[in-house]
Amino acid sequence: ISSSYVGNQVRTLFREKSAAGKKPSEIAKEVNEVLFNELSEFRFYCTAQIVQIFFDTDTILFLSAGHPEAIINRDSCRDIKLTGNQSPVIGLFNDENYREEIIRLSTGDSLLLYTDGIIEEHSSDNQEMYGVNRLIDSLNGTENFSSSEILHHALGNLYEFNGYRPQNDDITLICIKKT
């Protein structure tokens, strides 16, 4: 079975479960059961970050399964921190428990989601990895930036670190900012 076929099936599962109004933990648990029960012999698994935004309450339900913790940039107190919740990858083990986190965003706050390809990127001399601390440091002073400006600033910092070399891994960066 090709991974692209499985990827399409997993995407469809996520969409179906999301459209049914389920919470991120329920979505992850149900997709995990399907992957484990139907594809465990092939050892297929996936990582995911599931985000549900509730504009009426300024809250986000967030689940990270096998991805690095997201970064919350609090504008009001100039505080940048990691979310405190990580769940296992989806599809490898039966009967996993997944937990979402409730994040409340105030005006000016942002949530940064990223893949491990960013923090595992190597310096131009291959002596060190970028790491989560450098990513967090790249967000200092971006409180008044738009989400697009935050992304450009963070990626510019990363590319400067790696000497603008071609990437070896996927690099995905998403910024959700409350305006």
State where each predicted segment sits.
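Catalytic core of PPM/PP2C metal-dependent serine/threonine phosphatase domains
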Residues: I1-G84, Y98, N162-N168, I176
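Short gly/ser/thr-rich secondary-structure transition/capping motifs
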Residues: R43-Y45, G91-N97, G156
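DG-centered beta-turn motif at the end of beta-strands
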Residues: H67, T115-G117, D170
